[in-house]
Amino acid sequence: MTLQEFYARVGGDYSATHSRRPSEALIKKFVLKYPGDPSFEQLRAALDAQDWELAFRASHTLKGVAQNLGMDRLYKAAAALCDAVRGPKPLEDASLWPPVLAAHEEVLAAVREL
């Protein structure tokens, strides 16, 4: 799979990412590191524990990682959840979690094919 195909699959913007980081090798290097980023698992654990401060921090970090890597679908899902727990305050809309989970799993599956 090419990086362009990867970005199409995960709902990302390869052109915008490439304009910020002109080296395709560098983009691929950082994309391949995504599975090792702890923010998603920290977010999952925080939501399970109803630790809203940690949920905010983890979702904010995940949002930033996704945005920096041009993974727009994951970024938008994480941003919506981040805004919901900002304060920090309890997550009142549980429907915000499944899009984050789905986008994360989609990225992981696509990374395995790079």
Regions inferred by a protein language model and the residue ranges of each:
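Two-component system phosphorelay core
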Residues: M1-R57, T61-L114
